[in-house]
């Protein structure tokens, strides 16, 4: 990042943004986490649900058991939990359309009134040479058969390849078909080689669209979630940034913003406990007030413990990929007694080695010890 320019040269009004404006030209790129600290808000936790497999078939009992465990953990701490279905944790890129639809139907049958978020992406565009919004239509139509859900428009190669103005137009074209609230999705190339995060102008344009209620951003190398949060809070935008940073869980909790992460699938009780511990006693809904009358400072050690565990779940392979986190998640959930099988989707090549169960047991030593010390249930 270049040196901080003089504050009077920084853009602070959205009307001054241009499609080519970079974040470092704005005031929001220079807002610190400390400036955004929030001990009052109780944002939701959006937890991506693993679709476990037994052999080559989905383990439906395991799938539902994971969601029951998540909801029970969140209810204990008074946290709003929104399951995220058919995202990367749910093998969206390997799911056939019928299996995609079955995931949603089985969820809705078991949980008839629970809100959920569902990922949609482009289908059938492998031979395309340009962006086609209609590629999103098959999964979008399947998702919108259900009520009380939000649609996460996951980025795709040709949508991401567009310049900011045409990329905005692409999202707006997809939004014409939205009948449910929409969530936009951005990645850094550190996750997917062709991905680029949103420029400030593009974020402002999308955040101003009435059908988009929020967005998820996942980055490893630059703090775009802080940029988003600073801009949206400063401008009072009716748009909720969601952190997709599995390596930075504490940041979202500390600044009072929602999480939308695959990591939550294996550590929901820890995240919910941390969210409650971070709240000041003055928050009426705080489940476990402290004797000191303020937030529980032991949360800092809980942050460390849960992040050290998720750093193991999301560890890089020698190709620089974390995609096998899904397999690690299955082993972690089996170690917790939530599921009984750790197979992956038969067409997914992202797998850990045969010692993964032991690796996860080792990674869970500290968080389990912290859970016992703090009286956090459902993580024995």
Positions of predicted regions on the chain:
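Active-site beta->alpha loop and helix N-cap motifs at the rims of alpha/beta catalytic domains
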Residues: 10-197, 349-352
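General structural feature for long, well-ordered alpha-helical segments within catalytic domains
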Residues: 59-66, 99, 103, 132-135, ...
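A short, hydrophobic/aromatic-rich structural module that often spans a beta strand
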Residues: 20-26, 37, 170-177, 228-241, ...
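C-terminal alpha-helical cap/extension of soluble enzyme domains
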Residues: 6-36, 44-52, 73-77, 257, ...
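Catalytic alpha/beta core domains of metabolic enzymes, predominantly
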Residues: 177-322
């Amino acid at each position: 990042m270049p040196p901080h320019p003089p504050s009077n040269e920084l853009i602070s009004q959205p009307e001054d943004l241009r499609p080519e404006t970079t974040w470092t030209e704005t005031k929001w790129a220079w807002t610190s986490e400390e400036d955004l600290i929030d001990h009052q808000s109780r944002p939701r936790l959006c937890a991506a649900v693993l679709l476990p497999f037994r052999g080559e078939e989905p383990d439906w009992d395991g799938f539902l058991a994971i969601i029951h465990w998540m909801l029970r953990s969140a209810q204990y701490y008074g946290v709003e939990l929104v399951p995220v279905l058919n995202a990367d944790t749910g093998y969206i890129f390997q799911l056939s359309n019928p299996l995609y639809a079955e995931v949603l139907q089985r969820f809705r049958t078991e949980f008839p009134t629970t809100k959920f978020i569902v990922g949609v992406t482009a289908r059938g565009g492998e031979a395309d040479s340009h962006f086609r919004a209609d590629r999103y239509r098959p999964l979008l139509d399947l998702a919108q058969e259900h009520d009380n859900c939000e649609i996460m428009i996951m980025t795709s190669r040709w949508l991401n390849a567009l310049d900011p103005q045409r990329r905005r137009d692409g999202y707006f074209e997809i939004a014409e078909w939205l009948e449910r609230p929409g969530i936009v999705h951005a990645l850094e190339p550190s996750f997917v080689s062709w991905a680029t995060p949103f420029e400030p102008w593009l974020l402002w344009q999308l955040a101003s669209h009435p059908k988009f209620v929020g967005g998820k951003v996942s980055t490893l190398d630059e703090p775009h979630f802080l940029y988003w949060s600073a801009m949206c809070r400063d401008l009072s935008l009716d748009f909720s940034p969601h952190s997709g940073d599995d390596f930075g869980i504490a940041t979202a909790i500390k600044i009072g913003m929602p999480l939308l992460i695959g990591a939550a699938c294996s550590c929901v009780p820890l995240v919910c406990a941390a969210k409650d511990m971070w709240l000041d006693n003055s928050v009426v809904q705080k489940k476990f007030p402290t004797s000191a009358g303020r937030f529980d400072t032991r949360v800092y050690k809980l942050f460390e413990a849960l992040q050290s565990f998720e750093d193991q779940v999301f560890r890089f392979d020698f190709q620089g990929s974390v995609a096998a986190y899904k397999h690690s998640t299955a082993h972690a959930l089996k170690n917790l007694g939530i599921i009984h099988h750790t197979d992956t989707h038969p067409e997914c090549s992202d797998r850990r080695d045969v010692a993964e169960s032991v690796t996860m047991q080792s990674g869970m030593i500290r968080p389990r010890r912290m859970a016992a010390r703090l009286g956090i249930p459902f993580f024995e």
